[in-house]
UniProtKB/Swiss-Prot annotation:
This is Large ribosomal subunit protein uL11c. Belongs to the universal ribosomal protein uL11 family. GO terms for molecular function: large ribosomal subunit rRNA binding; structural constituent of ribosome. It holds the Pfam family Ribosomal_L11. The gene is rpl11. It is found in: Plastid, Chloroplast. GO terms for biological process: translation. SUPFAM superfamilies: Ribosomal L11/L12e N-terminal domain, Ribosomal protein L11, C-terminal domain. PANTHER family: 60S RIBOSOMAL PROTEIN L12 (PTHR11661), LARGE RIBOSOMAL SUBUNIT PROTEIN UL11M (PTHR11661:SF1). Part of the ribosomal stalk of the 50S ribosomal subunit. Interacts with L10 and the large rRNA to form the base of the stalk. L10 forms an elongated spine to which L12 dimers bind in a sequential fashion forming a multimeric L10(L12)X complex. The lineage of its organism: Eukaryota, Rhodophyta, Bangiophyceae, Cyanidiales, Cyanidiaceae.
Amino acid sequence: MGKKVLAVVKLALPAGKATPAPPVGPALGQYGVNLVMFTKEYNAKTADQIGLIIPAQITIYEDKSYSFILKTPPASVLLKRAAQIEKGSNNGTIVASITQEQLQQIALTKLPDLNTKDVKKAMSIISGTAANMGIQIL
């Protein structure tokens, strides 16, 4: 029989730069997880994606061991990076634009975490996020 799961914690952390300070410390410390070991593992697995926010789903077991799964970065982070902007628009005003090729690349990156396997549908989902952020698709 497998290990008994104590909790599942979801965190969005900067790639390669996680520290035992908040939000990691309070979220995992209450379950007795070795914070230094977790941050070292997380930083090692995300070292090639520095500058992005990488969500992690951490499963904590009763013996205080853990496992974690890395997800793809949020679409908004990928869109801001492609459009080379710091912040999207909050009122629908066009603040930047990206090409269809950039949109397709973002959709391919996000495909494992989306509820579709079709690239065209994934592009549609991402373009909706882009429109809400004030990013125009050329």
